[in-house]
């Protein structure tokens, strides 16, 4: 490339960070990273006449270049070191020049999107990515570019140092700044950066809850509990960003106090990994960016769980299972937006790929910390009955092969309403032969972060969560919106029974014009089946608009054979097994645009079923064909 400021590996340079991939996790990560890089390279804009986009990575979904696409520079350099192929360094330089033109700011920050007034907090992620590049692959840069990068990183460090406090944005930002400042301080030899990085890391420890071990602070108010005593917790951001950055801080600083706190918290969050590697963030405050494999724009869980695998053998399995799932979700070199995104014809946002490529690059650069993994099980692989997490008012249920989640979590994200489900909702029903059967989405799909989410243009779109609802007077009333709902669990050797009480309320917790409508929803789990019972107060809707009903979206990808046996039962073939659904009331299939509805949260399709009566019992069984 004309004017390139990057050079090949110098004579005698030894890049010791790339391991020989002795374990499946590292072999798979290396393979997947190359696939993702190929996908990203194919989308890089090399037409210099496209001035604004030249050098950036084009997003097929958003028809634009995302402001954080420069995060791919770090993976490109890693692959340049591994393969000795100059195409990666050429692409990295071109991408850096795009960053410099389009998102770099005079105050040292980088914009989240190439738009005036865009969020600057993501500067910390760009700074970490470029500092890792300089630290691990500086030998691939010629002196002039290396010095240019050092100067630019110093400006970014000053921005972070001067602006970030423990209450800057959501908690993932100051936690990331703890590692970012320490790393910049080490790479650039700026002692004050390291001092503030340590202060932020230790201040962040008080955000790890004493009861359950969750990281709180994903939304405000930081310090004021909800009515049920809950604080703001988001599984996706915790496992894919905050805990990885605290891990990196602890390892670089040799800070055992931080590493012990992180280890405890990782064990708590590990409870929510499904056996297939999916993250059950059906309840999180920021689950508007939840995809089944993680979160749309965060980095990935591999950094924390792989690099601390020596502390708990199950950590290695967490990282491995999730990486396997990432591979399954990768098509044509890009990580798709959920298991059913492609089957529903959803274009792939490139953000998933360049963000998650950083986690794989990080563990590959650090080398395999666990050469001989000890066999271990994930918590949800075991049939343990019921576990309650009071921090989030959520139950995890495990009976036979069924895995379920029921939540009454009452902390919403900032001032937004109708985000994650509550009300005693069944937010996850999973079976090893079929994967997810019932899954919660947002109560109302809203673009809380429009630049980081995809618009839903389907006129038949709806929430995926099983629920009771009533549309009347231009408002939507649902039991899954009720933040005051109660949940009781009965755990016996033969069965698990969950009884919930809630009301039909709108997003502001108000009753419909007809008055208070009480709902009673129960879930029964045995080794053989799952039974769901719905009931709500009968009302005289004659003077009201619309009719209440029970809505039951059954997760099913386009192409899965479905047969209605009669008006009260159906059978479906999923992954070589058969699901039988039966009800004591007629089932009505609601309109769709092509046989299925799709929800970006968490990237799944479903067949929407409706029951008009105010009482219904549904039974689900799964068996091999």
Residue ranges of predicted features:
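A generic secondary-structure signal for well-formed alpha-helical elements
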Residues: 5, 10, 134-137, 185, ...
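N-terminal export signals
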Residues: 1-17
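Beta-strand-rich recognition/accessory modules
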Residues: 582-625
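Short, low-order "capping/linker" segments at domain edges
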Residues: 576-579
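Aromatic-lined, polymer-binding surfaces characteristic
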Residues: 61-81, 85-259, 286-294
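Long, well-ordered core segments of solenoidal/helical folds
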Residues: 27-56, 90-109, 147-167, 192-219, ...
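Extended polysaccharide-engagement surfaces of secreted carbohydrate-active enzymes
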Residues: 256-260, 270-549, 553-572
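N-terminal low-complexity, Pro/Thr/Ser-rich intrinsically disordered segments
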Residues: 18-26
